[in-house]
Swiss-Prot record:
The chain crosses the membrane at residues 41-61. This is Late embryogenesis abundant protein At1g64065. It is a single-pass membrane protein. It comes from Arabidopsis thaliana. GO terms for cellular component: membrane. Signal peptide: none annotated.
Length: 214
């Protein structure tokens, strides 16, 4: 019997089309959700940030400070002084330029107030009225021509006056208390601003020097 030659053929590879490979089944993965704990942390963080911003804004807009009042300049006129050791005297007219600065976010409305001039520690030698008015937010109002008539006739004790007259200087102090209210975002607050300015009246030169306001 003649042996038959057997040839084993490798299996033929079948290649599919490229479009068939790409159109294979797609695997859909379910989107993972954030744990409930993280959402709670995010919410609390946002609340804390909003609360902090509210505190910062309230501290800026709702903070109410005292308006600043000061004497910018003072001039003199009709100055007279003299007498003797038993009857010394002085008389003068002071004309002041006063400013009131309101640094708040609300208007400042103040009532009529009194400006007093004090001679050293001996007492009041003159006073006048400052009419009330309105100072808008972040504005400065200048009150010009505030006239005060001063004189030693108001003093009960003229001790040391003769010595000061001979030296040619009088130590004076102007004091004013301004009371008013400030309205910010519906809130009304009463504030009292106090002015205290020291100065020296030069009798020889007939002018004010060393003006300093606290």
């Amino acid at each position: 019997m003649v042996d038959e030659d057997r040839i084993t053929l490798a299996p033929t590879e079948i290649y599919g089309r490229s479009d068939e490979e790409q159109s294979g089944p797609r695997i859909w993965r379910r989107k993972t959700e954030e744990p409930p704990g993280k959402c709670l942390v995010y919410s609390l963080t946002i609340i804390v940030i909003i609360f902090a911003l509210c505190l910062i804004l309230s501290s800026i807009f709702l903070r109410i400070s005292k308006p600043e009042i000061e004497t910018r300049s003072i001039s003199t006129r009709d100055l007279r002084s003299g007498g003797n050791s038993t009857n010394p005297y002085f008389n003068a007219t002071l004309v002041s330029d006063i400013s009131i600065r309101n640094s708040n976010f609300g208007a400042f409305e103040f009532e009529d107030s009194t400006l007093r001039v004090v001679y050293a520690d001996h007492g009041v030698v003159g006073e006048t009225k400052i009419e009330g008015r309105r100072v808008e937010a972040h504005k400065t109002v200048r009150i010009t021509g505030v006239v005060v008539e001063i004189g030693s006739f108001r003093l009960l004790d003229t001790k040391d006056l003769d010595k000061d007259l001979r030296l040619g200087f009088l130590e004076l102090r102007s004091v004013a208390e301004v009371r008013g209210r400030i309205k910010v975002l519906g809130r009304k607050r009463w504030k009292v601003s106090v002015m205290s300015c020291t100065m020296r009246l030069n009798l020889t030169g007939r002018f004010i020097q060393n003006l300093l306001c606290e």
